[in-house]
Amino acid sequence: MNVPAPHARLLADVVAAGLSHPLALAGGHALEAHGLIERPHANVDLATEGPEPMEEVAATVGRALTDRGHEVAVGSLTPLSAQLTVTDPETGETSELSLHKEALRHPLAVTDLGPVLALEDAVGTKIRALYDRGAAVDLIDARAAAARFGFPELEELGRRHARDPFDLPTLQSRLTGSDYYPDSAFTAYGLDAASIPDLRAWAQEWSDDIAERLLEEGASPDADPEP
């Protein structure tokens, strides 16, 4: 796996903390653990379905990392997520650590890096990210997931993890919006320039597939997304 040393140390120290409800690797690292993709990672995502309030989870993780020599600064905090900036004790490099509350559908997988979201949960949360924000990295990861799942399957996995109504016209807008991202948004995550047109064409293919299904179901593919 393409795991930078500071990220690996951070993960090892979180696992060693022995939390009552384990934090599982999520995001791009989880997709990589399942063999879907290998790319640079801007942050570390960890997820839990434990009942503890996120404020308590963030405080517990922060203390555990501080006890092991990391410097920790807590950033934004919501009931479902927390952002921490963690400074590696050996290199002085900083890493962004994102904590998430999730409703998981499958048992965690076990890897050398510790617990990891099951493949379906890892992909579902990534499709939710594509739906919610539509970042270039989300599109890269969604295409990697398409090696294992068809378009309707990806949509269903995303729907299972959605926190708001999940409608196909909104997903379409995220897919077609990839044309507005500069190439640098893709190359920053390891995609070579020659592959970017193929990725955009794949996104258009998915959008067209959604449009065809909406027409078959009697819905207009140009309908405004639900508010």
Task: Label each residue range with its predicted role.
Residues 1-227:
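Compositionally biased terminal segments of proteins
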